[in-house]
Curated annotation (Swiss-Prot):
Keyword presence, Ligase: no
Name this polypeptide is given: 4-hydroxy-3-methylbut-2-en-1-yl diphosphate synthase (flavodoxin)
Alphabetical list of InterPro entries matching this protein: Dihydropteroate_synth-like_sf, IspG_bac, IspG_bac-typ, NO2/SO3_Rdtase_4Fe4S_sf
EC code(s) of this entry: 1.17.7.3
Obligatory cofactor(s): [4Fe-4S] cluster
Keywords, sorted A to Z: 4Fe-4S, Iron, Iron-sulfur, Isoprene biosynthesis, Metal-binding, Oxidoreductase
Record-level GO BP terms: isopentenyl diphosphate biosynthetic process, methylerythritol 4-phosphate pathway; terpenoid biosynthetic process
Cofactor note (record): Binds 1 [4Fe-4S] cluster.
Sample GO molecular function, one term: 4-hydroxy-3-methylbut-2-en-1-yl diphosphate synthase activity (ferredoxin)
Family that this chain belongs to: Belongs to the IspG family.
């Protein structure tokens, strides 16, 4: 197997969102946000459970009204994953969801009004062991910062974040994480770099409003990949105009590609050419769908010919190399006497993968 790259993780304090550690030496948590009406309890619960099934560590829910807060109470009772309540402007909503067992508050102290209101929320969070996420966004910078800098800049996002941090520091509250999101990759990356040097709190990564599935996934992979490779980031959310389930899958794929955290099978497959001896694309697509239930980390190479196939198989947990009517089979980097019939390759490969998972990791764990 390939050696794991060395990424020196930025030192940060550790907080807990429910039972999920964020920061310090904790695994980088992957989260998403519901896009249902929160007052539609049934739909919201169904979406949260779908996110849980694909590995979401944390789920954020928008709570814009008191009616939504009452719905949040019912939602919280029906799910297991930690929930973050996304709240703006009305501090009373924060107090209400705290009463209902929220695991984290996404709330900017500076936009909920007078000092006494801020103190009420912070005191409530402290009394109930609820962390706070300060979430700065390039699209909603304070007016004075827009006037000062003329446009969103890394320095403007940093100054906004530090304003909110200063409020919590003044109130002796240190259980918080911070994000400085932008839809522009370079703006977001440089803002996070500045913030990483300025504070010790955990950082929540994201390229906000990244776009539809394809463009948003690419933007997020580029931006977050740059930061993660530098050791910056303690939790992440991929923002897509798509099914939130896809956000979790893309998030894990980014971490998997950097070998930071793995979930499920990492398929290594050739783009195909006229040398392929079997339908590589169809095989990979079918296996990705069939094996979504597997969370044990594993590298599986599926190469259509003998040019690169043997080399990839040598560094894979399980590999197949295309041959005439029958394809070569590798296990833990060693070629096996057994060969696969190309006409039944998908079924045979699925059986071998499941057998290896059962032998290697009976509990099918995630790392």
């Amino acid at each position: 197997m390939l050696a794991k790259p060395t990424i020196k993780r930025r030192e940060s304090t550790k907080i807990y969102v429910g039972n999920v550690p964020i920061g310090g030496d904790a695994p980088i948590a992957v989260q998403s946000m519901t896009n249902t009406r929160t007052t539609d309890v049934e739909a919201t619960v169904a979406q949260i459970k779908a996110l849980e099934r694909v590995g979401a560590d944390i789920v954020r829910v928008s709570v814009p009204t008191m009616d939504a807060a009452e719905a949040f109470k019912l939602i919280k009772q029906q799910v297991n994953v930690p929930l973050v309540a996304d709240i703006h402007f009305d501090y009373r909503i924060a107090l209400k969801v705290a009463e209902y067992g929220v695991d984290c508050l996404r709330i900017n102290p500076g936009n909920i009004g007078r000092e006494d209101r801020i103190r009420a929320v912070v005191d409530c969070a402290r009394d109930n062991n609820i962390p706070i996420r300060i979430g700065v966004n390039a699209g909603s910078l304070e007016k004075d910062l827009q006037e000062k800098y003329g446009e969103p800049t890394p320095e403007a996002l940093l100054e906004s974040a530090l304003r909110h941090v200063e409020i919590l520091d003044r109130l002796n509250f240190d259980q918080f994480k911070v994000s400085v999101k932008a839809s522009d990759v370079f703006l977001a990356v440089e803002s996070y770099r500045l913030l990483a040097k300025a504070i010790k709190q955990p950082l929540h990564l994201g390229i906000t409003e990244a776009g539809g599935f394809r463009a948003g996934a690419v933007k997020s992979a580029v931006g977050l990949g740059m930061l993660l490779a530098e050791g910056i980031g303690d939790t992440l959310r991929i923002s897509l105009a798509a099914d939130p389930v896809e956000e979790i899958k893309v998030g894990f794929d980014i971490l998997k590609s950097l070998r930071i955290r793995s979930r499920g099978i990492n398929f290594i497959a050739c783009p195909t050419c006229s040398r392929q001896e079997f339908d590589v694309i169809g095989t990979v697509n079918a296996l990705e769908q069939r094996l979504e239930d597997i969370i044990t980390p594993m590298d599986v190479s599926i190469i259509g010919c003998v040019v690169n196939g043997p080399g990839e198989a040598l560094v894979s947990d399980l590999g197949v190399t295309g041959g005439n009517k029958k394809s070569g089979y590798y296990l833990d980097g060693e070629r096996q006497k057994e060969r696969f019939d190309n006409d039944d390759l998908i079924n045979q490969l699925e059986a071998k993968i499941r057998a290896k998972v059962a032998a290697q990791d009976p509990k099918n764990r995630i790392i």
